[in-house]
Regions:
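Short N-terminal helix-initiation segments at or just after the protein's N-terminus
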Residues: 20, 63-72, 88-94
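N-terminal strand-loop-strand
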Residues: 34-75
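Unchanged
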Residues: 79-152
Length: 152
């Protein structure tokens, strides 16, 4: 025989409090969900280059002597400094790694943020680098072995 569900419902201990659903809704009304964890924060620039009416992505090959991820193909980027925004970080790292001044980079938009299993939060920015800037690239020898373009 089925039990009456309402009769079978018991109040938990301490259920005499006055907390209401409205109270909970008020607490969460302005809350923005975020990532849980102890993250290290990084930013990258996903650089587009318009060259001879074609569009390219610019990639780096990380220096083989790097402690982490040597020889990997990546975008310019690195760890966030405490005094900068994530966008400023992406632009600073592009300058440090391949010598393109931030004044020459036009940021189009922020892309999705990637949260990794190893507690990295990677902020990504899509930007445009003028073709003329490619003539003046200066690699950080400690970080970059080469750069190359891939047509889209």
């Amino acid at each position: 025989m089925k039990k009456n569900a309402k009769k079978g419902l018991r109040k938990g201990r301490g259920s005499r409090n006055t907390l209401k659903i409205e109270d909970i809704e008020a607490v969460f009304a302005e809350r923005k969900p975020g990532a849980e964890g102890n993250f290290k924060f990084f930013s990258v620039l996903v650089p587009l280059v318009e060259k001879e009416d074609d569009l390219y992505l610019l990639y780096e090959v990380r220096a083989k002597n790097m402690e982490r991820q040597p020889g990997e193909i990546c975008f310019p980027g690195g760890e966030l400094e405490p005094v900068e925004t994530t966008e400023e970080c992406a632009l600073r790292e592009t300058w440090e790694e391949i010598g393109i001044p931030q004044e020459q980079i036009r940021v189009i938009t922020q892309l999705d943020t990637l949260y990794t299993y190893s507690n990295f939060a990677m902020y990504c920015y899509l930007g445009v680098i003028p073709e003329a800037a490619l003539e003046h690239l200066q690699f950080s020898e400690n970080e970059v072995d080469e750069v190359f373009l891939v047509a889209l």
